């Protein structure tokens, strides 16, 4: 059996869905541009630099989910996927995913972006499993807090282990495993699989991939 994992943002997508969701909310007038846009950009730069405090960021990013009704959120999300995400889906990424699914492999998208934003994106690719940061909800409304461990850096590895355990599986049961990612933030999970693949990597991951002899590919 083969396990194949895909990062989402800047790997299967030509951009970052979490950042774009924030920009979409700004453009829709859901959040105030003056403050939100600057914070969104600041956190995105910290992510790229590897200095992001994930809990501070999630307090910011999940706030709008708690402030609005599920009906409004779902309506905005539908427009977001149509207007912002579908143009970001890379045809070569679709082909890559389809090839692994067609081979009968166990496939999942593993992303730090929350599952409310990413669930419909993952469905666009036909991937049956999503491992993502989970926003907490109570009585049908989001609370603005995180449920469980954020799916970021070492947390990605933990969340994948938990997901596999829920299926009655473990990494050691797979004859082969691979993970496709663009980011140095994903090194803990890249180091765990048999075959790490750097996809249009950031400079830090590109250097690490060359050092370790990992393949580097482009889906752009």
Language-model-detected regions and their locations in the chain:
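Active-site neighborhood of HAD-like aspartate-dependent phosphohydrolases
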Residues: 1-52
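Electropositive phosphate-/nucleotide-binding environments in soluble metabolic enzymes
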Residues: 15, 37, 51, 55, ...
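Acidic/polar active-site rim loop that often engages polyanionic ligands
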Residues: 18-21, 58, 138-145
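Short, compositionally biased "basic patch" segments
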Residues: 44-70, 134
